[in-house]
């Protein structure tokens, strides 16, 4: 019986890639989108590509990031799926190579139990172009899943994972 369901966020629960949406709002879409596609296909190192993509956001107003994070489009059926899993007492978690600025509002809307992601560094309401957090490497999700399984005392057959990219 499934007791834990872990979802990726970008292009899985959310319809699109947060970094691409932020880049478009900051007129840096062209610079970021190709890197995102290549990283998700496993052609680029996830950590290096994340750093490079975030560097293009340097100078972006942080309050704009937060507003965009509030309005990210969720996939059709996301609410119903999470509601169903919650009704079965399945612990629902988001593992995102994206950002808390995007997943945190969605977690509240969807009633997700827990989320792990990265943070966009900022000072004086301006992005620094740097990123940090628990999901910065290609193996971060696997390591966090193992920790979570141990913490919840679960076996592999009690866990379901849903994702779309090379780091999922």
Question: What positions do the PLM features span?
Answer:
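A generic local structural motif
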Residues: 78-80, 146-148, 166
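A cross-family signal for key residues in well-ordered alpha-helices
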Residues: 20, 146, 163
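Alpha-helical substrate-recognition element adjacent to the catalytic core
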Residues: 1-119
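Acidic, divalent-metal-coordinating active-site segment for phosphoryl/phosphodiester hydrolysis
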Residues: 101-103, 163-168
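Substrate-recognition "cap/lid" segment bordering the active-site pocket of phosphatases
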Residues: 105-159
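Short, hydrophobic beta-strand segments that form beta-sheet elements in well-ordered domains
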Residues: 94, 160-163
């Amino acid at each position: 019986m499934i007791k834990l369901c872990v979802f990726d966020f970008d292009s899985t629960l959310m319809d699109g890639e947060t970094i691409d949406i932020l880049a478009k709002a900051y007129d840096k879409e062209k610079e970021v989108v190709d890197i995102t596609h290549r990283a998700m296909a496993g052609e680029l190192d996830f950590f290096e590509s994340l750093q490079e993509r975030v560097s293009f956001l340097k100078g972006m107003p942080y309050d704009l990031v937060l507003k965009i994070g509030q309005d990210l489009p969720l996939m059709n059926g996301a609410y119903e799926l999470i509601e169903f899993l919650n009704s079965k007492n399945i612990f629902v978690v988001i593992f995102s190579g994206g950002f808390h600025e995007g997943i945190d509002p969605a977690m509240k809307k969807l009633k997700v139990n827990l989320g792990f992601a990265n943070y966009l560094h900022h000072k004086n309401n301006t992005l620094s172009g740097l990123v940090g957090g628990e999901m910065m490497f290609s193996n971060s999700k696997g390591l966090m899943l193992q920790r979570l399984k141990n913490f919840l005392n679960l076996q592999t057959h009690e866990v379901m994972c849903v994702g779309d990219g090379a780091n999922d």
